[in-house]
Amino acid sequence: MKTKLNRRGRRQRGYRGLLWVLAAGLLLFGLIAQQNILLGTSSRHALLMDARTGQVLARKRSGEEAAPASLTKMMTVLLATEALPDLDTPVTLPEDIFPALYKADASMAGFQPGETVTVRDLLYGAMLPSGAECCEALARQVSGSEEAFVALMNRKAGELGMKHTHFANCTGLTSPEHYSSAADLAVLLQAALNNETFRTVFTTGQYTSSVTAQHPKGLYMASTLLSRLDGGEVTGGQILGGKTGYTDAAGLCLASLAVVNGRVYSGHAGGTRKPRDGADQHHGCCAGVPQTGKEKMTGLRQFYR
């Protein structure tokens, strides 16, 4: 099993290397925020939003329905934070969820079958390393089954006005009945960031889980986005947090939050096939003065207080 997990981990790290390049380019568009810039990106669909006002600054096929990959986990984490306010509640990862996840080659945080962790551990495990086992465990804890939890996901999507979204699972694995759009994912993130627990998890770069028999030193986790960026600083600003995703059907996907010159932006992109273009966008679109971590957190507190 270790060989299989290590192989999966190497493949995931390769994808993550491509994703951070995409992030550096796409999410500081707010400095110029012009439609023709987005039209030139390799992302099939993208959207840039002022995260404070909700104003859409630029878009490209933002209403097109497409596979969201692991961006799905934003909804899973949001619902779990709403339903499970006691983050210290113990949860045992069901052994029966693992075979199907291994077979699907789903991304995993690294928890083991039968391991007992906390809700907090699972939230970070779902968001930072994109652990599918964490999503499945949270779904079971909230609703008793993934099917029942997915019904909650679709109900929440309807309440938020996500008209081009339908969920078929809580992890983002490819399914014909599992789709969303850049515009809908922007709406989801906008709503989720008003949840303090979600916001904290979304903007965290690294985390170590509670001690268990299987992990006597805890399980170290790093954000698939921020771990590739030195402190989140890129030319022109600071990436505060984000969620990456990849499947063959979805391509490279990203939802992220960045601050530039005191203004907070939400960026969403998917269907990207050419990581090189992300670097081109980074050099062509980013300018300004990078902010320190202190400025970043102060601005975020002011924005969401």
Annotate each predicted stretch with a short phrase.
Residues 1-15:
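N-terminal Lys/Arg-rich, disordered targeting/topogenic segments
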Residues 11, 33-34, 301:
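Intrinsically disordered, low-complexity regions enriched in polar/acidic and amide residues
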Residues 14-18, 59-62, 91-95, 103-107, ...:
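A generic short-segment signal for beta-strand/edge and adjacent turn/coil regions
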Residues 15-35:
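Sec-dependent N-terminal signal peptides of Gram-positive bacterial secreted proteins and lipoproteins
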Residues 21-22, 27, 73, 282-285, ...:
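Generic low-polarity alpha-helical segments
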Residues 40-45, 144-304:
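Penicillin-recognizing serine hydrolase domain
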